[in-house]
Amino acid sequence: MSFTIQTVTFTAPQPLGALPDSRGRFGRFGGQYVPETLMSALAQLEAAFNQYRHDPQFLAEFAGHLRDFVGRPTPLYFAERLTAHWGGGRIFLKREDLNHTGAHKINNALGQALLALRMGKRRIIAETGAGQHGVATATVCARFGLECIIYMGVHDIERQKLNVYRMKLLGAEVRPVAAGTGTLKDATSEAIRDWVTHVETTHYILGSAAGPHPYPLMVREFQAVIGRETRVQCLERLGRLPDVLIACVGGGSNAIGLFHDFLDERAVRLVGIEAAGEGIETGKHAATLTAGRAGVLHGAMSYVLQDEQGQVQEAHSLSAGLDYPGVGPEHSYLKDIGRAEYYSVTDSEALAALSLVCSTEGIIPALETAHAFAYLGILASQLHSEQIVVLNCSGRGDKDMGTVARAMGWGKEE
């Protein structure tokens, strides 16, 4: 296993896989917009990451845990009945939902926990929206005997109770955040406040490819195993690379993990799907790359949902993991240069897609993942039968059954 960055064919000022630059920038995006008290911690983190990202012992330990604890590599599954249903390209699913804890989040949480141990930081904090990153962080903290504190918005706690119970069972302290809308943005803000106060003893395991440098780089590199496996599996099984990669995008870690190994393969389309909520025109959505503009949120320059005065707007999505008014800086850059395409689907479209996938493939995807499935139905009609599409099935939907049941009207008294 290696963290060596892929470079080759895409015609850009420099290979896309080589970004960010030395200042932590993806073009105009990224950087470090944080209080002075965090600058030394970020410098320490960057130095540690650069030291260990190529260290054979660290990489061997990381790879061993990914294999034996997480269960990698995850399968590349041919969705035969979905392929027949939509009648377009051949659809394959990268089954990140089969990881230990049920999503891609464990890849990054594991990598950062190993890094924290080497930095001597035994108090771990994290933010979570859908709860999957919180569960993954609590899991690795239990595995390595680390103190674990998870910040979660009160609204998300209500709609993701199952994951709250899992975190507590794993030994984590779950701290409710009532500020703002009580969702992921507010949980992230509270986690950053904690980090500022306890910076000497605490490592913040940020869950998405967002935040100040080096987090977007570091999270991407720990998640890039998704794309590396996909490349190998496609070549071994199909004899060539896929034509299209598609993934849901909130902050963007599962998507960039899939995309990264293919950034400089310009024949491969990269498609990210955001949450349109109740519709872009209603203002109740989380489609940052569709309707946002450049701004600063949680320590980095990226696309942000904001009003005319530059105030961050509330995001809305039925999916707690996509309910965020920002996005990672690398996705912002890929949008600007046209290397990746970004679209959005509504709550109702995601629910319909979730039902379809359940009934045709016997797979219950997370609501986040269901957004990618919803657009896949549109995309499939544009493809011929020999084209290959790989969708990142980023998580399983057990956690969403309460939300789905309420949305479907199940369980109501007649």
Swiss-Prot record:
Enzyme class, spelled out: lyase
Reactions mediated catalytically: (1S,2R)-1-C-(indol-3-yl)glycerol 3-phosphate + L-serine = D-glyceraldehyde 3-phosphate + L-tryptophan + H2O
PROSITE patterns attached to this UniProt entry: TRP_SYNTHASE_BETA (PS00168)
Cofactor: pyridoxal 5'-phosphate
Keywords: Amino-acid biosynthesis, Aromatic amino acid biosynthesis, Lyase, Pyridoxal phosphate, Tryptophan biosynthesis
Residues bearing the modification N6-(pyridoxal phosphate)lysine: 105
Record GO biological process: L-tryptophan biosynthetic process
Signal peptide: none
Subunit and partners: Tetramer of two alpha and two beta chains.
Protein name per its UniProtKB record: Tryptophan synthase beta chain
Species for this entry: Gloeobacter violaceus (strain ATCC 29082 / PCC 7421)
